[in-house]
Amino acid sequence: MKKNMRRWEAVLICMALLFSLFSLHTVEAKDEETPKTIFPVHVIHKTGDDKENFVIVIMGDGYTADEQDKFLQDAKQKAQGMLRWSPYKEYSDHINIYAVQAVSNESGISVYGGKNADTYFHVKVYGKAAGFSNGGDEKAKELRQDLEQNYLDRGANVATIHVLCNSE
C-alpha cells in the first residue's frame, strides 16, 4: 500500500512539474456576477487575492460523475498534505488552492499495455511515469485558461496544476 502511495505521489509531483513548465501569463477576467467555468470549481484554501498569491489548481482524472465527492475529499487531503511540506508550509498564507471537478466517463486511469480507461485528461501510466495521451494536455491548458478568464480574481494566473488520478 505504501509503495503504491509513493508511486502515486511521484506521479503527481511529475504532473505538477510538467504543468509548471507551461508559460505563465496574465489574463483579464471578464466582468460577470456569477463565474461560469467548464466544470465546477471549489475553494480548498484561500488566503487572499489570486493576483497576489501563488495559485494551485487540483484537477481530477478518472473520477466519474458519481465519484466527484470522493475527488473533493481526495483533493482536500492532497492540499492539506502539501501545506504540511516545505516550502508550502512556510508560504501557506500566500497560497490559494482550488479543485476543478473534471468528469471522466470511466473510473480509474489507463495503464500502458493494460487497462485503457475513457477519462477526461487521458492520463496513462507508463511504468513509474505518467503522462497525457489523446490531447489531454490541451484539455488541461483549456481549463487553465477558463479559470484565469472566468473564475480567478482579475489579472491572476494559475501557477501550477496538480492532476490527481483516481487509481481505484
For each predicted feature, which ranges?
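Positively charged, low-complexity intrinsically disordered regions
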Residues: R7-W8, T26, Q145
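Zn2+-dependent metallopeptidase catalytic core
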Residues: D31-A159, L164
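Bacterial N-terminal signal peptides that target proteins for export
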Residues: M1-L12
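Hydrophobic helical h-region of N-terminal Sec-dependent signal peptides
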Residues: A10-F22
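Sec-dependent signal peptide cleavage junction
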Residues: F19-E32
